[in-house]
From Swiss-Prot:
Enzyme class, spelled out: hydrolase
Domain of life the protein comes from: Eukaryota
Organism: Hordeum vulgare
Catalytic residues as annotated in Swiss-Prot or TrEMBL: 158, 297, 318
The name this protein goes by in its record: Cysteine proteinase EP-B 2
Pfam families: Inhibitor_I29 (PF08246), Peptidase_C1 (PF00112)
Expression induction: Synthesized by the aleurone cells stimulated by gibberellic acid (GA). Repressed by abscisic acid (ABA).
Keyword Hydrolase: yes
Biotechnology: Orally administered proEP-B2 may be well suited for treatment of celiac sprue; can be expected to remain active during the gastric phase of gluten digestion but be rapidly broken down in the duodenum.
Swiss-Prot/TrEMBL GO biological process terms: proteolysis
Glycosites: 130
Cystine crosslinks: 155-197, 189-230, 291-343
Keywords, sorted A to Z: Disulfide bond, Germination, Glycoprotein, Hydrolase, Protease, Signal, Thiol protease, Zymogen
C-alpha cells in the first residue's frame, strides 16, 4: 500500500458503510404510474416526499411549489420508465425546486468573470506517462485518500469543496495521513480572487493555500455554509495539523487522456455543467447526459473504471451530501467523444502539487506546537 496504511483503508471503508446507512434513512421516494394519475395522488406523493426529506413548507409556498414538483416527478418517472439511458433518476431533496432556484442555490457559482491564477508549478508532471500503461481502474476511496462526502448547503462554495478533495487526497498519498480539511477557511479567508458563497475558482484556492501557509483542519475551522470573518489565526491555536502544498498544475485542456494520467496518480479538481435536470436528479448508473459545457459547478474526480456493460466512467465526488446520487458520487461517462469530455469534465481540470511530506511551516502558522503535513 505504500505510504497509505491499512488502518487508513479500514477507516475509509467503515466511513463508507456508515455513509450508506445514513443515506438509507432518507431513501428515494418510489414512484409508480398510479402516483401520477391524479392531482390527489400527486399531492399524496408530495406529502410523502416532504416527510422523507424533512421539508416543511407553509401553505401558500406548498401550493406555489406543487406545480414544480409535479413537473419534476413526471420528468423523473418518464426517464426511468423509458429505460433508454444507463442511469436512473430519483426524487431527491431538490424535488420541488425549479431549475432557476436550483442553479442559483447549488450551482452557477464558479466565478467565470475572474481569471484563474496561473499554475505556480509549470508544466504537466504526468505528460510522459503512457496511457496504455495506466491501470484499467482507479479508486482513491479504496486507497484511503478520500474523506466522507460533505454538503455545501445553500452556499455557492463548490469551488472550495472541489479544492479540498484534491488537497486532502494528495496529502494522504504523500504522508499516509487522511485529514479532513476546512472549506470554511477558504470561504472566509481566500477573498482576494474568490468570493465565498458567491463563487470562486479552484486554481485560485490552490494558490491561496500555497501562499498562506497551508490549510487548517475541518475540526478546527468547521463549515457554516455562510461567509464570515476570517479567524484562521484563532482556529490554528486549536489545530494540531496544517496541510501544505507546493502549488498546482493544470491538466492540458480538453484531454481526457491527460485527465486519466493525472487521476491515476491523485484526485483532481474539475468543473462541469451540473444545472440540468438529469444531473440534478441523478440517482445511479453511468451518467451519459444530457448536459452541455457551460461550466457552473466544481467537483473532483477520484477515480475511473468500466461498468458491467462496458461503458467507461469517471468517479466524481460531489458536495450535495450523501443522499444525492450514488452516496454522494456520480459516475460520468468517460471517453464519450464530446469535445472537452461529457459535461465539460476535461475542460478545466487542475490538481495540487505536493512533493514533500513536511515542508517548513510559514511564520503565520507559528502559533504553538502543531504538526505540519
Amino acid at each position: 500500500m505504500g505510504l497509505l496504511s491499512k488502518k487508513l483503508l479500514v477507516a475509509s471503508m467503515v466511513a463508507a458503510v456508515l455513509a450508506v446507512a445514513a443515506v438509507e434513512l432518507c431513501s428515494a421516494i418510489p414512484m409508480e404510474d398510479k402516483d401520477l394519475e391524479s392531482e390527489e395522488a400527486l399531492w399524496d406523493l408530495y406529502e410523502r416526499w416532504q416527510s422523507a426529506h424533512r421539508v416543511r413548507r407553509h401553505h401558500a409556498e406548498k401550493h406555489r411549489r406543487f406545480g414544480t414538483f409535479k413537473s419534476n416527478a413526471h420528468f423523473i418517472h418518464s426517464h426511468n420508465k423509458r429505460g433508454d439511458h444507463p442511469y436512473r433518476l430519483h426524487l431527491n431533496r431538490f424535488g420541488d425546486m425549479d431549475q432557476a432556484e436550483f442553479r442559483a442555490t447549488f450551482v452557477g457559482d464558479l466565478r467565470r468573470d475572474t481569471p484563474s491564477k496561473p499554475p505556480s508549478v509549470p508544466g504537466f508532471m504526468y505528460a510522459a506517462l503512457n496511457v496504455s500503461d495506466l491501470p484499467p481502474s482507479v479508486d482513491w476511496r479504496q486507497k484511503g485518500a478520500v474523506t466522507g462526502v460533505k454538503d455545501q448547503g445553500k452556499c455557492g462554495s463548490c469551488w472550495a469543496f472541489s479544492t479540498v478533495v484534491s488537497v486532502e487526497g494528495i496529502n494522504a498519498i504523500r504522508t499516509g495521513s487522511l485529514v479532513s480539511l476546512s472549506e470554511q477557511e477558504l470561504i472566509d479567508c481566500d477573498t482576494a480572487d474568490n468570493d465565498g458563497c458567491q463563487g470562486g475558482l479552484m486554481d485560485n484556492a490552490f494558490e491561496y493555500i500555497k501562499n498562506n501557509g497551508g490549510l487548517i483542519t475541518e475540526a478546527a475551522y468547521p463549515y457554516r455554509a455562510a461567509r464570515g470573518t476570517c479567524n484562521v489565526a484563532r482556529a490554528a491555536q486549536n489545530s494540531p495539523v496544517v496541510v501544505h502544498i507546493d502549488g498546482h498544475q493544470d491538466v492540458p485542456a480538453n484531454s481526457e487522456e491527460d485527465l486519466a494520467r493525472a487521476v491515476a496518480n491523485q484526485p483532481v479538481s474539475v468543473a462541469v455543467e451540473a444545472s440540468g435536470k438529469a444531473f440534478m436528479f441523478y440517482s445511479e448508473g453511468v451518467f451519459t447526459g444530457e448536459c452541455g459545457t457551460e461550466l457552473d459547478h466544481g467537483v473532483a474526480v477520484v477515480g475511473y473504471g468500466v461498468a458491467e456493460d462496458g461503458k467507461a466512467y469517471w468517479t466524481v465526488k460531489n458536495s450535495w451530501g450523501p443522499s444525492w446520487g450514488e452516496q454522494g458520487y456520480i459516475r460520468v461517462e468517460k471517453d464519450s467523444g464530446a469535445s472537452g469530455g461529457l459535461c465539460g469534465i476535461a475542460m478545466e481540470a487542475s490538481y495540487p502539487v505536493k512533493t514533500y511530506s513536511k515542508p517548513k511551516p510559514t511564520p503565520r502558522r507559528a502559533l504553538g506546537a502543531r504538526e505540519s503535513l
